[in-house]
Amino acid sequence: MLFSEFAQVCEELEHLSGRLDMIEVISRALPDLAPDELPVFVRFVMGRIFPDWSAQKLGIGPNLLYEAVRQAAGVKLETVITRINQQGDVGRAVEDILAKKTQVSWSHQDLELVYVYNKLTGISSRGGVTSQKEKIRIAMLLLGDASPLEGRYLARIMLEELRIGVGEGTVREAIAKAFMVDSALVEHAMQAINDLGEVARLAKKGPTALSDVHITPFHPVKMMLAQQGTIAGMIEDHGEIAAEYKYDGSRFQFHKEGAKARMYSRRLEDVSEALPDVIDLLSKATSHDVILDGEVIAIKDDRPMPFQSVLRRFRRRHDIAEAQEAIRMVPNVFDILYLDGETLIDLPFFERRKKLETVVGKFVAPQVVSTDPQTIEQTYHDALAAGHEGIMLKVPASPYTPGQRGKNWIKIKPEVDTLDLAVIGAEWGEGKRAHVFGSFLVACQDQGKLIPLSRVATGFSDEQLTEVYDLLKDAVISRTGKEVRFEPELVFEVGYAELQVSPTYDAGFALRFPRFIRIRDDKDTTEIETLESIRGRYQRQAKSAQAYTK
């Protein structure tokens, strides 16, 4: 497939809003692709280059891309930045610049999809400061051979932000339709290998290839997620339920095979180097080959420390021994996905729990199983008294569903209205805060697109604003006066008094008294609040207000 053909598919998708229409367009494109083209097409159409489980990073930020565009088009850097600021969209700005370029490439060639992929993966393998020139050179050569339309999507892919609204669910359905296989088989394979690109390649071979895929160590699996609910509702729906403490720590996945062991974060990043003490504890706790799911917390004086203490350990890359002395980490394991060559995710939770207690023992999270609401309520109060966030309620007969947020896991914690939102823009601060960003534009998601919801300017200490500035300064993609826009990569937890209907933001809502709570380093922008869930919150809020006034 030529990259120009891929760009035409993207342009068609960009003008669609209906999910079924998107599925149709993608499913038409997939069958004619060669086996080596399928993984590339699928990842690219979702704005990705590497599978979620991969530790590879492209390493091209906005500034490197702007320099590559400058060289490819033969224009001044100021021209590139001005056009991007005017457009507010890197892709369309690059398209305009390439349409008017005066510099001609004498070695022009038609770009092929796999060729572009190979060049980009080559960029990712180059490390160190001296590699920046080589990254710019490769990006410049690709852009130099690109048509204006190709340039629009090539630039966005380099920033891994395609902005055409295609999410995993859409692509899963398109794969099933294109190759006439059961969508449950596509889901099974995705749960096992966590790479829709590879799933598409297997689907082309047929249903047997999909069903033969299994979970393996050192290939992290997306973690099962919980939604909000009530104790009464869970008992009414399921009778007997399992209650566990909800820890204010960081989710982890522990993989062990033989003498080798690694740990992965909620975002599937390998954090083994930062947590050698936790790996050592779990490795000594079991002699089996396992994949475990759990939460690690920081402990001081037998009490859990704040979430930020855990994050500091996850971020640490140097002076690990010193950090181990300062912050003691304790793992709490609550599930097992793999044991000695056997995938366990389809087993009922109570069976997985029995295996877990046999295999690990010491670090298994405490659990209470009951049909009695008062017993579960007491467990909830015990959790709060011990300094934890609340409790998790789980259905004993439920399977483990990687990456899904369903009714089989429910979180119960004190009523605090917060949302996890992506940071997409900011304004510079004033006075003593003029050297950092002072307020932030945050967004929810809707069908794979980020939708502005509110601005957040309170709740930050000076130290936190400096930390956020350091995290975001290299992610700036455009500037207009005091306003900047970011490549979306950071998630804030934002508190608020209430949701209000508002025409100010594209979401149609605004937050009353929004305040910064914390950075969610453990989440990426695909896990933020959806517009649908915000509508649901608003409806529940309205019903509560009506009940109060009666």
Curated annotation (Swiss-Prot):
The gene is lig. Keywords: ATP-binding, Cell cycle, Cell division, DNA damage, DNA recombination, DNA repair, DNA replication, Ligase, Magnesium, Metal-binding, Nucleotide-binding. DNA ligase that seals nicks in double-stranded DNA during DNA replication, DNA recombination and DNA repair. The active site is at K246. It comes from Methanoregula boonei (strain DSM 21154 / JCM 14090 / 6A8). Its EC number is 6.5.1.1. Belongs to the ATP-dependent DNA ligase family. It is an enzyme of class 6 (ligase). Pfam families: DNA_ligase_A_C, DNA_ligase_A_M, DNA_ligase_A_N. One of its GO terms (molecular function) is DNA ligase (ATP) activity. CDD domains: Adenylation_DNA_ligase_Arch_LigB (cd07901), OBF_DNA_ligase_Arch_LigB (cd07972). It comes from the Archaea. GO terms for biological process: cell division; DNA biosynthetic process; DNA recombination; DNA repair; lagging strand elongation. Its cofactor is Mg(2+). ATP binds at E244, R251, R266, E295, F334, R405, K411. It catalyses: ATP + (deoxyribonucleotide)n-3'-hydroxyl + 5'-phospho-(deoxyribonucleotide)m = (deoxyribonucleotide)n+m + AMP + diphosphate. This is DNA ligase.
